[in-house]
Amino acid sequence: ATPGPASTAEPKVILIVGELAVGFGKLEMPFVMFD
């Protein structure tokens, strides 16, 4: 993987953050339901 300009790196970071948010959302759902 060759390092590219920030313009191409930013969308990847946004996708990673989005996936983490979805992952945390799935993990928190059961706890929220029990609360």
Swiss-Prot record:
Posttranslational modification: May bind 16 heme groups per subunit. 14-15 of the hemes are low-spin bis-histidinyl coordinated, and 1-2, high-spin hemes.
Alphabetized UniProt keyword annotations: Electron transport, Heme, Iron, Metal-binding, Sulfate respiration, Transport
Source species, domain of life: Bacteria
UniProt keyword Metal-binding, yes or no: yes
One MF term in the entry's GO annotations: metal ion binding
Annotated GO biological process: anaerobic respiration
Primary role: May act as an electron acceptor of the enzyme hydrogenase or as an electron donor to rubredoxin.
Subunit structure: Homodimer.
Name the UniProt record assigns to this protein: High-molecular-weight cytochrome c
Species: Megalodesulfovibrio gigas (strain ATCC 19364 / DSM 1382 / NCIMB 9332 / VKM B-1759)
Encoding gene, per UniProt annotation: hmc
